[in-house]
Amino acid sequence: MAQILLAEDDKATRDLVKRALESDGHTVTVTQDGSEALEQVKEGGLKFDLLVSDVEMPMVDGVALAERAFPLQPGIRVLLMSGFAEQLDRAKELSGPHVAVISKPFTLDQVRESVRKLLA
């Protein structure tokens, strides 16, 4: 299964998404904000298949994180999540076959389906 980097500042959301992805057989590395996630990407110890990130986070937001992750880990896929319309619009600017955007609140089935499509 996939190596997934999860960047989410809300603990409840982070824990739910992590458990769902792990129950599907993925290995999940968890970070609490964009700068912590960026450090994981930069370290290069793990090659991540997928970045799952909130858009609105302290320090480095999810869109900036994705933009920085692409050259550091070529081939990485990105799932961006947000509850704010203007942030969703910004996230959709990264659109392509390697990026998906879902709005909060979401169901775990929506997360799983988005992950499945991105990794296919």
Residue spans for each PLM region:
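Receiver (REC) domain active-site loop signature in two-component systems and cognate sites
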Residues: 57
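Active-site residues of response regulator receiver
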Residues: 54, 82
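Conserved acidic carboxylate
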Residues: 8
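Charged docking surfaces used in two-component/phosphorelay signaling
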Residues: 15-23
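Acidic, metal-coordinating helix/loop segments flanking the phosphotransfer/catalytic sites
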Residues: 30-50, 70
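Alpha4 helix (beta4-alpha4-beta5 surface) of REC/receiver domains from two-component response regulators
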Residues: 64, 77, 84-103, 108-116
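Acidic catalytic/metal-coordinating carboxylates
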Residues: 33-36, 60-65
